[in-house]
Amino acid sequence: LGDYLAEDELDGIRICREVVSHLNWRKKGPGATLPIDEPLYDQEELLGLVNEDLRVPFDIRDVIARTVDGSRFEEFKPLYGPTLVTGWASIHGYPIGIVGNNGPLLSEPSEKAAQFIQLCNQIDVPILFLHNITGYIVGTDFEQGGITKNGSKMINAVANSTVPHISIIVGASYGAGNYGMSGRAYGTRFTYIWPTAKIAVMGPKQMAGVMSIVQRAAAERRGIEFDEEADAKRAGIAEHWAEERSKGLFATSRVSDDGMIDPRDTRTVIAISLSICHNQDVAGTKEFGTWRM
């Protein structure tokens, strides 16, 4: 039995859209509550912000300014932990908290992120994570300074947060940094990537370097001469292998995200995602307080 007859697949999709448009669906969550203004900066410029070489830095605020309503961004603690940008804005009238990378994650930005994520839960605001992260900083000084403890605060806050998370990987998203920035494994409501995205346990050069260190140490333990030529060849193969498999196209082809998007469509994609999130009540967990510095 059927109520409609479609000529082909496209006609069937058209009929489905018409049926859905008359369902009179009402969202449980709040709708857009703030003024909807186009960004003051040209969204076409998003195409040139991220260099093909991800070692070339860029300011994540440039992405934010070309994405949010009226380019308005109320930054939270801008002078503390400046390698992580946090603050509030709106996209198509939907309030949103934003967490974006401007360098590696150290103790201070990790603490700032933990507090900000919990604040967003206190006021029931979804969070947008903009990834360009090589990971948490490592080294004796940083470890003695508490990076493990403070980094875990951020991951703890991400894991316990119940407001919708939307992640967009604009550059690198490596290792534990991916977890701290609410990667796919942390149940984000939506995850999108730009064509410039790279996702891996670590950068290709770093991985090849670690392999060389391990092989060199093994040769020393066995008391044999280390073959530099073979090591260079092996490292080159490993680096190429890791480079190809860290590309965004490789990841998205395996459905590890919700799609690769044109950077110029970022604002529209986020707005649609927020609208979907607001089909249900947007409620943050109130079971923990706000961590102070």
Specify the residue positions occupied by each region the protein language model found.
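Ligand-binding clefts of soluble mixed alpha/beta catalytic domains
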Residues: 1-293
